[in-house]
Structures are given as C-alpha cells and as structure tokens.
C-alpha cells in the first residue's frame, strides 16, 4: 500500500485503531494444525446500505493434531455451519467461530467447511454512498480487517485461492481478484440483478481478497507485457473509474504496461491473470490487492493518481502479493520492496539523475523521522499494533536498505538473488532470512552483519567529516568520526572532492574501524578543493556533516 505523508498514516491509525486495537493486541500466529487452501464466497450485495448475506465454503487441510478449527469473524450473525455437508454445532465468540471437526484417518486430511452468515458490515467491506449519492462497496482488508466480512484465518501466513460469486444490482460493475469466469442476469422478485463469478487461481493472503461493486467505467489497455506473465502469457490491464472520470484516462496510468515489463524482467513472471486499477474508497493512498489494485478516490478527482503510487502498488504484485511476509514484523519485505522498485521504475523512466534525487529524498524522509526510525528496528518483533508498522522503517528505510544491499553485493548478484528469492517463494510466504539466504548464495558473502545492523537495530550512522588543505603536501586531510547516538556501523564511505582545476578525486573509506575513534584519510589534490562531499552517489543511509577545519 502507499502512503505519501506521515499525516496520512497518523490519520489512518486514528481512524482504524478503535475498530481493531483489541484484535491487534491478540494477533494469533499461524494455526499450525490447519491450512485453508481455497475460499468460495457467494455474497449478495444490496442496492443500498451495508447489510449483506453470504455463504463461504472453505477447503481446509488438517496438517497437525488439532480437532477444532477457529475462524476469525466479527460483527456478523452466523446462521449455520456445515462440515462435509453436515450441519455441526459451533461456538460463536465475539471475534471467532470455533468449529469441531470430525476425526479422519490419514495425513493432510481435507474438510469442506461451509459458513452461512449475514448482517451489516462495519469494516473490511466499505459500504458507502459516493459523492454523487451512488452506493459503492469496496474490500479494504489490510492488515487484519477481512474478519469483518470473511470467515477466515486472517493472517498473512495462510494463503489460499478464492472464487467470488457476487450478486449485485444490474446497474453496477463487479471486479474482483483473478479472472472473470461468467456473468448472468438473475431476477429477485421483479428486480433484475446480475451475478458475477471471478476466480483467483493463485494462493493469496486473505487481506488481499477483495471485491469492488460500484458504477464503474472501464478504460482498457488490452494485453500488455506479452510473454512476461506466468506461462508466457500477456497481462490484460484496465483502469476502472467513476463514470464521470473516464474521460481523464489514461492520465498517469499511461505507462502501466511498461511498469509490468520492467518488474517482470527484473524479478520474474507477472503472477496473476490480469491487472486492474480501480478508483475506490480505500482508506490508503493505494492498496495492492492481488490483480485488482484499489486507489484512493480523491486523487482521481484532483488531477490524477501519482505515477510513483501506481509503480509502488504495481511492484506489490510481486512483493507482498505473490511473495507474502509470513509474519507481520517482516512487512518491510512488502513495503520496502515496493518503495525501492518504484524508485527503480523512476530510474528506468527518467534516468539516473532523477533516481538519485528520489533516493536522496527518501533518505531525507528517514533522517527527519522522529517516531519510528530512531527508536525501533525495521524488523520490529515487539510492536503489537499492526497499523503502527506503517512507518518510515517499513517503507523508506526498508527501501534504502535494499539500495545499500545492491551496492554491497553488486548488481548482478543482487538481481540474481531477487529472481531466485521470487522463484522459490512465489505464491507462498517468506521471512527476512529467506532473502538473506539468496543474497549470500549469489554474492558468496556472509551478510549476517549487514542484515543485523540495518534491520535489527534502530537508527543509522551519523558521520562528521572535518577537512583541511595541506598546501605543501598537495593533499586534503579528512578526519571522519561516527557519532555515538546509535552506536558504530560498518559501511564503506565515498569521499569526493573537486580541486581548483576542476578535477574530481574520490576515495572510499572503510568505516568499520571508526568504532574505536577517528578515521583519517589523505586525498591528493593539486589545489585547494572547491567542494568536499560525502556519499556523492546517495548510496548510504547516514546523517552526513562536512566542515572545514
């Protein structure tokens, strides 16, 4: 998902915390005894209002010794539960349903669990009238809000395929994950309605399972990135907007085909059946739902969604969607990757100079943060409020760590490792050590120190450089000192100077020994330098201060 300002994050946290704080404090780990492999959800969406009626059919594999399946479901009335077609007793608690499962012999036993439920949704499926008074319905599940309308194991570690069977007013369009299988007209009394069936055949986490039901106009790009999707297919892409916004298309979406081409070549095949971009009621700047990205409504009405946001959400189709963080503390594998690959799109589209400017802006954002970066590590195992993970650590610092990792191992090893990481964990889950394994294998380096200092410690290095010109020696003497606020870090630091003749001189300093004091370096210079710069290529996350002695 995308945030563009810290204020947006604070606003979202304030808006949502009341709804999920009680549940965020009690986030259960993955249920090791059960694996939901498929959801089939039939849902009836009303003309107006928030009351739905739905039936969910879950294919559940028992992988351990448990005999009670616990599904997350808030708010709604459960009318009945079946297991393998037979009605069973169940225990309804405020946030869960406990379903006893009959004993079956054998390993990896499969059950078909049916849940009939109804009621007024309060979150997860956002039901509201738009600015023109038209009722719209958009799934908006991150991080664990699917439980407000989908009986599920609402945790990123449990991925499944999903079929949506949505019955809605005939005046509305329905878009969901995956491929459209069919539509047909149905009659409810005298009212004409339409049933839409969508199927996502790749396993995705529940927080990415969504529907859109709204008056939508389609702008079709046709087939893009041909040969670069799974099975060497093309990627059908469309933008869906409110009808009155259709004339503004393609606008900032004009290059979505090129984005998919770039990311496919850098990472691996596009993972889904299509890619839809939708104007929606998501509470985030953008939400990366698998194959159906939802963008905030307001930018469509105020000049267009920023291209950087589109690139960020598109990159999520590989990182976060196809490869999902197994545990929430590793959410940087989603948000940090999307941040950095959006910057790589900038590089491909606008060149190295603009890319460096963007990375410098990302670094400034990190250094200006006073909430998360100075106090918490990127991999934050102590944070219990999931929304608080939407911070500068997960996004900007995570992205900049990838930038430094690329410099550490080199381009070839970096992208080879990214491709193997994606290939091994596509349609599954990963944690940070899975990425480290691939980086070490491709680079032939031990990177434990790198991952520990940048991801498991708060802060960043703070370096002060003082310099003077030695005229008799025709050299510049530079003293480099690390600050003590966050402790000493290990990194190479490039010192660049331009002498009076306009000649550029560079020296790379190993700052490992700076933990014990000051590092001194001498750089030849024919005359007094006109500038002395640290990290001219914007390759290092650090606060850098240069003064002349």
Language-model regions: role of each:
Residues 54, 141-142, 152-311, 340-343:
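Hydrophobic helix-coil surface modules that form long, contiguous segments used
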Residues 29-31, 116-163, 214-222, 538-549:
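Glycine/proline-rich low-complexity spacer/linker segments in large multi-domain proteins
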Residues 68-69, 73-133, 188-191, 197, ...:
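A surface-exposed beta-strand-loop module
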Residues 349, 391-478, 500:
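Amphipathic alpha-helical substructures
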Residues 201, 335-404, 408-409, 425-426:
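Acidic/His/Gly-enriched intrinsically disordered linker/tail segments
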Residues 12, 16, 20-53, 132-136, ...:
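N-terminal, polar/Ser/Thr-rich
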Residues 53-75, 162-169, 433, 483-496:
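Surface-exposed beta-strand/loop patches in extracellular or lumenal glycoproteins
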Residues 77-84, 175, 447-448, 462-463, ...:
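Beta-strand-rich binding/interaction modules
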């Amino acid at each position: 998902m995308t945030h563009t300002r810290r204020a947006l994050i604070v606003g979202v946290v304030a808006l949502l915390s009341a709804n999920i704080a009680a549940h965020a404090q009690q986030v259960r780990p993955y249920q090791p005894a059960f694996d939901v492999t498929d959801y089939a959800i039939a849902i009836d969406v009303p003309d107006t209002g928030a009351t739905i009626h739905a039936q969910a059919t879950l294919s559940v594999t028992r992988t351990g010794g448990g005999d009670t399946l616990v599904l997350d479901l808030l708010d709604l009335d459960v009318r009945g539960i079946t297991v393998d077609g037979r009605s069973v007793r169940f225990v309804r608690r405020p946030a869960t349903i406990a379903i006893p499962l009959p004993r079956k012999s054998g390993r990896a036993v499969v059950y078909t669990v049916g849940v009939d439920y109804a009621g007024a949704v309060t979150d997860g499926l956002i039901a509201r009238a738009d600015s023109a008074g038209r009722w719209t319905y958009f799934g908006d599940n991150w991080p664990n809000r699917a439980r407000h309308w989908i009986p599920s194991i609402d945790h990123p570690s449990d991925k499944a395929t999903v079929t949506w069977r949505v019955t809605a007013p005939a005046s509305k369009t329905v878009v969901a994950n995956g491929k459209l299988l069919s539509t047909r007209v149905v009659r409810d009394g005298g009212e004409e309605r339409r049933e839409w069936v969508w199927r996502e055949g790749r396993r995705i986490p529940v927080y990415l399972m969504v529907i859109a039901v709204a008056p939508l106009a389609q702008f079709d790009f046709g087939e893009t990135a041909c040969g670069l999707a799974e099975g060497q297919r093309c990627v059908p892409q469309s933008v869906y907007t409110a009808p009155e916004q259709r004339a503004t298309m393609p606008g900032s979406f004009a290059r979505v085909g090129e984005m998919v081409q770039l990311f496919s070549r850098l990472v691996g095949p596009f993972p889904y059946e299509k890619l839809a971009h939708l104007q929606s009621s998501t509470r985030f700047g953008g939400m990366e739902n698998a194959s159906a990205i939802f963008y905030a409504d307001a930018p469509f009405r105020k000049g267009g969604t920023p291209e950087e946001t589109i690139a960020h959400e598109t990159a999520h189709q590989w990182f976060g969607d196809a490869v999902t963080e197994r545990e929430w503390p590793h959410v940087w594998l989603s948000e940090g990757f999307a941040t950095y690959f959006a910057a790589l799109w900038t590089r491909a589209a606008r060149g190295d100079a603009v890319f460096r400017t963007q990375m410098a802006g990302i670094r400034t954002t990190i250094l200006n943060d006073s909430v998360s970066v100075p106090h918490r590590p990127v991999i934050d195992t102590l944070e219990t409020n999931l929304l608080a993970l939407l911070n500068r650590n997960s996004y900007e610092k995570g992205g900049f760590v990838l930038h430094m990792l690329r410099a550490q191992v080199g381009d070839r090893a970096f992208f080879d490792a990214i491709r193997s990481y994606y290939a091994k964990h596509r349609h599954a889950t990963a944690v940070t050590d899975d990425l480290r394994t691939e980086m070490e294998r491709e680079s032939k380096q031990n990177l434990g120190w790198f991952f520990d200092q940048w991801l498991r410690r708060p802060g960043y290095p703070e370096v002060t450089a003082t310099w003077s010109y030695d005229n008799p020696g025709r050299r510049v003497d530079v003293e480099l000192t690390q600050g003590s606020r966050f402790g000493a870090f290990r990194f190479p630091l490039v010192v660049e100077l331009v002498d009076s003749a306009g000649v550029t001189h560079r020296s790379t300093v190993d700052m490992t020994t700076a933990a014990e004091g000051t590092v001194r370096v001498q750089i030849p210079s024919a005359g007094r330098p006109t500038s002395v710069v640290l990290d001219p290529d914007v390759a290092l996350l650090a606060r850098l201060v240069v003064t002349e002695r």
